[in-house]
Amino acid sequence: MNMDHSKIPQATAKRLPLYYRFLKNLHASGKQRVSSAELSDAVKVDSATIRRDFSYFGALGKKGYGYNVNYLLSFFRKTLDQDETTNVTLIGVGNLGTAFLHYNFIKNNNTKIAMAFDINEEKIGTEVGGVPVYDLNKLEEHMTDDDIPVAILTVPAQAAQSITDRLVALGIKGILNFTPARLNVPEHIRIHHIDLAVELQSLVYFLKHYSMQEK
């Protein structure tokens, strides 16, 4: 089925990998069908939202039957391009960056950190988790084609913008930013900010000032 993915709400698009992960677990356990209520309980998204999310893709289930796990898994694998690997570069091989390199999204068939960059001479020229670490000063020498469209930033905040400018000039299309810096990028660049300190502060605030019923 052909569809215009730009018409899918961004909130829905962000939930698709969550659904896909749960469906993989269901398939591995031998389950053949699942209801929206079961999905809701597993992924902690209300069933009405799940049905609305799925409705953007047409008739994925049947009333009274639920959803065929194999069909859904196949559908979302294709929708999320799980059979096509996207190479990623990582900038900053500190504690967080090193953890990413060792993990390297081994449970995600479609994403892989292909190379990393740092300024630490003790790390340059080594491999971490099987990923080569290059000199950040030679970024432009190593990223010479369009095969790596995504970058992960785990660098000090003060260096983030200048590195981002270089990545944009090299044709990077998306950045996952783990620095506190709010980066300026052209409109055609997709950037997701993940500030762990802010998320933690937000969690503590909600625990103190909101009841569980208000979440």
From Swiss-Prot:
GO terms for molecular function: DNA binding; DNA-binding transcription factor activity. SMART domains: CoA_binding. The keyword Transcription regulation applies. HAMAP family: Rex. This is Redox-sensing transcriptional repressor Rex. The gene is rex. Residues 18-57 bind DNA. One of its GO terms (cellular component) is cytoplasm. It comes from Bacillus licheniformis (strain ATCC 14580 / DSM 13 / JCM 2505 / CCUG 7422 / NBRC 12200 / NCIMB 9375 / NCTC 10341 / NRRL NRS-1264 / Gibson 46). The keyword Protease does not apply. Belongs to the transcriptional regulatory Rex family. Pfam families: CoA_binding, Put_DNA-bind_N. It is found in: Cytoplasm. One of its GO terms (biological process) is response to redox state. Keywords: Cytoplasm, DNA-binding, NAD, Repressor, Transcription, Transcription regulation. Homodimer. NAD(+) binds at residues 92-97. It comes from the Bacteria. Modulates transcription in response to changes in cellular NADH/NAD(+) redox state.
